[in-house]
Amino acid sequence: MLKSGFYLLGGVVGAASSLPAFVAATTRSIWDPVNADDVAAVGEITALTALGHMKQSMMSDRTGRMILRTQPRVTDETLEFASRQPPGTFGHRYAQFMKFNRFTPNGRTPVAHIADPTLAYVMQRQRETHDFLHTCIGCGRTVEEEIIVKLLEWRHTGLPIGLLAVIGSLPWLSRQQIRNMELYFEWAEVNAPNQRHGEVNIPYITNVWWEYYLDKPYEQLLADTGITPIDVFLQQKKGKTALANGEAIDGK
């Protein structure tokens, strides 16, 4: 958490150095929090410090190093491959998500504010795999669900846009949704990177080769990443609350 605060401070410095662009993009993204172009611009302008950490975490991991070396891209061809996968696979779920939301990988906004080519790729990779993360954790594209995804990205990457997205989206949330933020922060913490012995291993999402799992069972992805989908977490919380109150989990 302290590291994330450091990356947020670095993001503030980055914003100050590109103040006009930052203010313009932030204003537009608050007005329209699902506007991909402006959210992307804010993310890049505030990302430099966090991107350095993301690169280091990838360099210290075998899969991460391979991703940096080969620089795979998520394209419409990736989606075509996923759409041919049978039900039960991660690829099928991903293709269904993309079809329902009328998304195409090639429609992703290209990185425009990061000069270093390696860091630019790291940012591009993060952007292109965003929909994989949506699919993995079971979130759609409402403002509230985007916040959930951004919080997990923030815990894994330190990118300030995660917290900025929460702050900027508050005017669009109901009181109940705002109260739910405590649960979402807890869920993101449960799913934070973890390599402690004897505990569930959760790799940095930057070190997950998502494309490898497209033709694999969805459950294999969850097992290998250690990530608990948001609906599973909420059901677990509901069950624990019921037990604490002396109730049956099924409410009977």
UniProtKB/Swiss-Prot annotation:
InterPro entries assigned: Coq4, Coq4_euk
Location(s) in or outside the cell: Mitochondrion inner membrane
UniProt keyword list: Lyase, Membrane, Metal-binding, Mitochondrion, Mitochondrion inner membrane, Ubiquinone biosynthesis, Zinc
One of the record's GO cellular component terms: extrinsic component of mitochondrial inner membrane
Required cofactor names: Zn(2+)
Pathway: Cofactor biosynthesis; ubiquinone biosynthesis
Record's catalysed reaction(s): a 4-hydroxy-3-methoxy-5-(all-trans-polyprenyl)benzoate + H(+) = a 2-methoxy-6-(all-trans-polyprenyl)phenol + CO2
Transmembrane feature ranges: none
Single GO BP term: ubiquinone biosynthetic process
UniProt-annotated binding residues for Zn(2+): 130-131, 134, 146
Top enzyme category: lyase
Membrane topology: Peripheral membrane protein
E.C. no: 4.1.1.130
Protein family per UniProt: Belongs to the COQ4 family.
Note: This protein may be expected to contain an N-terminal transit peptide but none has been predicted.
Quaternary structure and partners: Component of a multi-subunit COQ enzyme complex.
Function: Lyase that catalyzes the C1-decarboxylation of 4-hydroxy-3-methoxy-5-(all-trans-polyprenyl)benzoic acid into 2-methoxy-6-(all-trans-polyprenyl)phenol during ubiquinone biosynthesis.
Protein name according to UniProt: Ubiquinone biosynthesis protein COQ4 homolog 1, mitochondrial
Source organism per UniProt: Trypanosoma cruzi (strain CL Brener)
Lineage: Eukaryota, Discoba, Euglenozoa, Kinetoplastea, Metakinetoplastina
